[in-house]
Regions:
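Glycine-rich short-loop/terminal segments
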Residues: 1-118, 201-207
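Structural recognition of the beta-strand scaffold that forms the well-ordered cores
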Residues: 107, 119-123, 145-147
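Small-polar-interrupted transmembrane alpha-helices in polytopic inner-membrane proteins
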Residues: 115-131
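Interfacial helix-loop-helix junctions of multi-pass membrane proteins
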Residues: 126-143
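Active-site or metal-binding loop neighborhoods of secreted/extracellular toxin and effector enzymes
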Residues: 143-207
Length: 207
C-alpha cells in the first residue's frame, strides 16, 4: 500500500525529495504491540519480512530512520524470497538457498539504499528476532552471509547505462549464485541433515 502511494506520487511529481517520500510513507508504531495473526503465521526461518507488519521492534526502529529506504529493503526481501524459490526450488533454513537468500537481499538492498542502512536493517533482523541468541548457529550463518552479500556488491561491475531495469538485478543475482556455488557463503544443513557447525556452501542447486 505504501509502495503504491510512493509510485503515484513519483508519477505526479518529478524528482521528489527523500523528505517528501518519507512524509508520504510515515513512520510505523515501534511499541511492542501484539503481533498480528499474519505476522505470527510467517515463517521467519525460511522467509525475509516483506511488509511493515512483519518487522520486529529493532527493524521498525531502522525503518523509521528512513521509511523510503525501508520500503526498498522490504521490496528486495520479497525479491530474494522469490529468487531463492526460483533457483533452489523452495524456501529453506540452513541451506545453500538460505545463504543465497540472505546474501542476495543484502547485495540488492545495499545497491538501493547504501551499505550502512542495509547493514543496520539486516543486523536488526537478527538481533531483534524472537529468542535471539548471538551464539546460535543460524544467527552466525545469517550474519556472515548478510555481510558477504554486501561485501561482494562492492566488487561487482555494472554498466554505466544499463539497457533495462532488470540488468543490474540480473548481474547481482548471478554473482551471488556463483559465490554460493564456489563456497563463499556458509550453511549448516547438507543433504537434508543438520550439523552443529558452519560449512562452506557448494554447487548443489536443490534445498
Amino acid at each position: 500500500e505504501d509502495l503504491k502511494k510512493v509510485e503515484v506520487y513519483i508519477s505526479q511529481n518529478e524528482n521528489p525529495s527523500l523528505q517528501e517520500l518519507n512524509g508520504i510513507i510515515g513512520k510505523i508504531e515501534e511499541s511492542n504491540t501484539p503481533i498480528t495473526r499474519a505476522a505470527a503465521a510467517y515463517d521467519y526461518s525460511k522467509y525475509l519480512p516483506v511488509s511493515e507488519g512483519q518487522l520486529n521492534s529493532k527493524e521498525k526502529q531502522i525503518f523509521n530512520q528512513n521509511p523510503a529506504a525501508g520500503l526498498i529493503v522490504l521490496a528486495q526481501a520479497d525479491y530474494a524470497n522469490k529468487s531463492e524459490k526460483g533457483v533452489f526450488g523452495s524456501n529453506s533454513w540452513g541451506t545453500n538457498g538460505d545463504a543465497y537468500r540472505h546474501a542476495l537481499w543484502n547485495a540488492m538492498g545495499a545497491k538501493g539504499v547504501g551499505d550502512s542502512y542495509m547493514a543496520a536493517f539486516a543486523t536488526a533482523h537478527e538481533t531483534g528476532s524472537a529468542g535471539y541468541n548471538p551464539n546460535s548457529i543460524d544467527t552466525q550463518m545469517d550474519l556472515k552471509n548478510n555481510a558477504k552479500g554486501r561485501e561482494l556488491l562492492k566488487s561487482m561491475k555494472f554498466p554505466s547505462r544499463p539497457p533495462n531495469g532488470m540488468t543490474i538485478p540480473y548481474i547481482i543475482r548471478n554473482e551471488i549464485a556463483k559465490a554460493v556455488a564456489n563456497g563463499k557463503m556458509v550453511r549448516f544443513v547438507s543433504g537434508g541433515k543438520q550439523y552443529s557447525y558452519l560449512m562452506p556452501t557448494n554447487s548443489s542447486s536443490k534445498n
